[in-house]
UniProtKB/Swiss-Prot annotation:
Name of the protein this chain belongs to: NH(3)-dependent NAD(+) synthetase
Organism: Staphylothermus marinus (strain ATCC 43588 / DSM 3639 / JCM 9404 / F1)
InterPro entries reported in the protein's UniProt record: NAD/GMP_synthase, NAD_synthase, NH(3)-dep_NAD(+)_synth, Rossmann-like_a/b/a_fold
Matching CDD domains: NAD_synthase
Function recorded in the entry: Catalyzes the ATP-dependent amidation of deamido-NAD to form NAD. Uses ammonia as a nitrogen source.
DNA repair listed as a keyword: no
One GO location term (cellular component): cytoplasm
Annotated positions binding ATP: G39, L40, S41, G42, G43, V44, D45, S46, T144, K173, S195
Highest taxon in the source lineage: Archaea
Gene designation per UniProt: nadE
Length: 275
């Protein structure tokens, strides 16, 4: 069996759309919330999520927050985010986080030039803003992570990973792009290179060192076709070293996908459970 990218992207997008819309609607109703707030970056994941949420509960119940740090956020991303909310008439706010980031200079160990801790700080600041707005209006925080990013742990813990629901969490990145086409998003958004923009010039595939098409091939083989890791190269044509790297990403980031661990005491069978 040879697996190609066509096997991954050839899914019934109409059924996926319907299922996700019902999921969003049900989760908001179950929580007895009034609406939804989404962090909109101008990329394909957040744009697709915004449109699906809008379809689920109506434009009037959705707010988009555009939160650039103008020193590192590409101007094009801001423009694309603004284009989208204006096209559909979605309520939005542009909140520059430059000064909020700078306020952390009160910490004696703060250094804005450290890309990873400062980049993650930007993601966590955005999470705080989203939850402040959600608490203020009794809204749900809708996450925009896709399945590829979740499985390899390519998100900030308690940053963009800090959300209430992940509507596109069952779609690989390549599928999200096709979903964007299906929903009528322009090519300038659906084909835009993935860019968290947590620091200047930050591009996902450059940081990962692997294209998403390759990542998705390997993840699809492992998780959907249940192929043993050592046999993935012969089924996908992906180099064994790349397969090993993707698998390592998944395993090393397991903690991001789980609740914080709790020690088991001899007299406590289940420290935390639902009743």
């Amino acid at each position: 069996m040879v697996i190609t990218i066509k096997d991954i992207i050839n899914i019934p997008y109409d059924k996926a759309e319907k299922t996700i819309i019902e999921f969003i609607k049900n989760k908001i109703e179950e929580a007895n919330l009034k609406g939804a707030v989404i962090g909109l970056s101008g990329g394909v994941d957040s744009s697709v999520t915004l449109l699906l949420t809008m379809k689920a509960i109506g434009i009037e119940r959705v707010t988009a927050l555009i939160m650039p740090d103008t020193r590192v956020t590409p101007k094009r991303d801001i423009e694309d985010a603004l284009w989208l909310v204006k096209k559909y008439g979605i309520k939005y706010y542009v909140i520059r986080i430059d000064d909020i980031v700078d306020s952390y200079s009160a910490m004696p160990f703060f250094n804005i030039n450290y890309n990873i801790p400062t980049g993650n700080l930007r993601a966590r600041i955005r999470m705080n803003i989203l939850y402040y707005y959600a608490n203020l209006h009794n809204y749900i925080v809708v996450g925009t992570g896709d399945r590829s990013e979740i499985l390899i742990g390519y998100f900030t813990k308690y940053g963009d990973g800090g959300v209430d629901i992940l509507p596109i969490g069952s779609l690989f990145k390549t599928q999200v792009r096709k979903m964007g086409d299906y929903l009528g998003l322009p090519e300038k958004i659906t084909s835009k290179p993935s860019s968290p923009a947590l620091w200047l010039g930050h591009k996902a595939e450059e940081e990962l060192g692997i294209k998403y098409e390759t990542i998705d091939l390997v993840l699809y083989a492992l998780f959907d076709k249940h192929i043993e890791p050592e046999k993935v190269p012969e089924h996908t044509g992906v180099d064994p070293s790349i397969v090993a790297k993707i698998l390592e990403m998944h395993r090393k980031t397991r903690h991001k996908r789980l609740s914080p661990p709790i020690p088991s005491l001899p007299w406590v069978k289940e420290p935390i459970r639902e009743i």
